Design a protein with these regions (language model features):
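C-terminal non-catalytic interaction/assembly regions of soluble proteins
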Residues: 180-295
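Short glycine/serine/threonine-rich phosphate/pyrophosphate-binding segments
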Residues: 12, 33-44, 61-65
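Glycine-rich oxoanion-binding loops at beta->alpha junctions
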Residues: 1-28
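A short, small-residue-rich loop immediately preceding and capping a beta-strand
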Residues: 26-39, 53-55
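Short, acidic/small-residue loops that bind anionic groups at enzyme active sites
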Residues: 48-68
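Oxyanion-binding "anion nests"
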Residues: 143-197
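A structural-propensity feature for long, helix-poor, extended segments
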Residues: 69-109
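Flexible, glycine/charged-enriched surface loops at secondary-structure junctions
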Residues: 113-126, 154-174, 262-268
Length: 295
């Protein structure tokens, strides 16, 4: 969407003013709500524009498609008040009875505003952030980015071995994209990417289901990974992640699983982001157990 509908540039100051006035308190710092996609980068721009610090923490340790899907919800924190504005200057503040309602109302407004808005939410104390935030996630993202940029400088290891070591990932499959099925419903991108095995996986098949983010990875009919563990498709040569909107026929990818933040494996965490929440008829089993040691 941002390729067609860019950020205006005044949203950061407007959100800061709206939320601080509503709270009657000074806001001391920003943080990204998730470590994936543009939502990991905009808080950096906001902090730079307003001359304020950004904390090295987020609420997911990855990306999830809905606003209530954060570790702060596990801790009982409210998403609201939530300030919302678009690039035209339309704005509002929501107070909702649950974080799920925050998601529902924000998505409805977002679709009316052209499928892209800027929001500020989950105001909290430093103590709450320390207790429930995923610490060091920005630094971790920088480290992974550096590992990908220097993938050819890996000594006596192959680039693939270097990538898996740096990411602490489990290699689930390697294949060529044979088909991509997509459908847009209720403001989400649903779909499935089908893979034909290459290399050591030749003769095997796999598919990955997604709702904005990848939800399950299935190889030869056996589920090898599910949400909340992270499932990533990376280019087999550059090892740059391939987002769901960039999937296309013929592209060669490696399917990699990464362990999620420990709070997602609790009962409350799985209620929010476990496979059954997304309609997947399977119980959550940790990635490392499904892979029996993995790669």
């Amino acid at each position: 969407m941002l390729a067609e509908k860019a950020i205006g540039g005044t949203e950061y100051q407007k959100l800061y003013d709206m939320l601080s006035q509503f709270l009657g308190k000074k806001i001391y710092a920003f943080m990204p709500i998730e470590a994936g996609g543009v939502n990991s980068m905009l808080p950096i721009a906001a902090a730079a524009r307003l001359g304020m610090p950004m904390v090295d923490v987020d609420g997911m340790g990855r990306a999830f498609p809905e606003l209530q899907m954060v570790t702060f919800t596990i801790g009982g924190m409210k998403a609201t008040p939530m300030a919302l504005t678009d690039e035209k200057g339309n704005s509002c503040i929501f107070e909702t009875i649950t974080n799920k309602w925050t998601e529902e109302l924000a998505r409805a407004v977002t679709m009316s505003c052209g499928a892209s808005v800027s929001v500020s939410l989950y105001a909290m104390s430093g103590k709450q952030m320390k207790e429930y935030g995923v610490r060091g996630i920005v630094t971790r993202s920088e480290q992974l980015g550096k590992a990908i940029r220097t993938i050819k400088d890996c000594g006596n290891r192959t680039p693939e071995e270097h990538f898996l070591e740096m990411s602490e990932g489990f290699k689930l499959f390697k294949g060529k994209i044979a088909d991509v099925l997509r459908e847009t419903r209720a403001g989400f991108n649903f779909g499935k990417v089908v893979l034909e095995g290459i290399g050591e996986y030749k003769g095997h098949s796999a598919y990955v289901e997604f709702q904005n983010e990848n939800l399950t990875a299935t190889v030869d009919g056996e589920i090898l990974a599910t949400t909340p563990d992270l499932i990533s498709l990376v280019d087999t040569e550059t090892f740059i992640p391939v987002t769901t909107d960039a999937l296309k026929y013929g592209k060669r990818v490696m399917v990699v699983g990464l362990k999620c933040f420990h709070l997602w494996r609790t009962e409350k965490g799985l209620e929010l982001v476990g496979p059954r929440y997304f309609g997947v008829d399977t119980d959550y089993i940790p990635l490392e157990e499904r892979c029996k040691g993995g790669n």
